A protein has these predicted regions:
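Structural motif corresponding to the intra-repeat A-B loop/turn of tetratricopeptide repeats
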Residues: 12-14, 47, 80, 117, ...
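Residue-level signature for tetratricopeptide repeat
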Residues: 10-11, 43, 74-76, 113, ...
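Alpha-helical segment of the N-proximal tetratricopeptide repeat
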Residues: 1-28, 39, 45
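TPR/TPR-like (Sel1-like) alpha-helical repeat modules
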Residues: 62-67, 95-96, 121, 125-132, ...
Length: 188
């Protein structure tokens, strides 16, 4: 089982489908271990196998407990074209236990679900309520600024979108987003 997990982690970036096969093999050998189910859920998520990912992430939560994995589960609902369920998950009782970067990620997913449903103003408010701050720095701040810029762009508020892509560039100390190229495209 452990060898399959190691192989999966080795392959996940370059071959998510191959990594998923190793994750499934690990589950076949140790399906009652929470970390195995969580890993398989993440691998299925990375391979865009939304239904499998959602099932495995739910199983991992049943085994291990706690509010973790909600953002990924909500994003799976989006992948399954069920944005209303994603919002319900993001706003449900369990979400009250989510804090910090996990809460920011959950709100980004919720905002995306609202965009999927055409609720652009609701998406903007969701991101504002997540702690949007143009002076914040770090990966989560960059992701939040970037998501906000995306919704502004979808709302045809191009000038404001460019401003927030600029904030994302400033916040993104490790260049984890493509905010710089998005900003350049808007400035052309």
């Amino acid at each position: 089982m452990a060898r399959h997990l190691v192989a999966a982690m080795y392959l996940v970036d370059d071959d998510p489908v191959g990594a998923l096969a190793h994750g499934r093999a690990a589950k076949n050998r140790a399906g009652r271990i929470g970390v195995v189910r969580e890993t398989l859920g993440v691998l299925a998520y990375r391979a865009s196998e939304w239904a499998e990912a959602l099932g495995e992430l739910r199983a991992a939560r049943r085994i291990s407990g706690g509010p973790g994995l909600l953002a990924m589960m909500a994003d799976c609902e989006r992948g399954l074209e069920r944005p209303q369920r994603a919002i319900e998950l993001a706003r449900g009782d369990e979400s009250q236990q989510v804090t910090g970067d996990d809460l920011v990620e959950l709100r980004i997913v919720e905002a995306g679900a609202r965009v999927d449903m055409g609720q652009l103003d609701g998406a903007l408010v969701t991101l504002q309520d997540a702690g949007l701050d143009s002076s914040a720095r770090g990966e989560e701040a960059a992701r939040l600024d970037y998501a906000y810029a995306e919704v502004l762009l979808a709302s045809e508020r191009t000038r404001e979108a460019a401003e927030w892509f600029g904030h994302a560039v400033a916040a993104d100390l490790g260049d984890s987003t493509d905010a710089r190229s998005r900003l350049a495209a808007l400035e052309d």
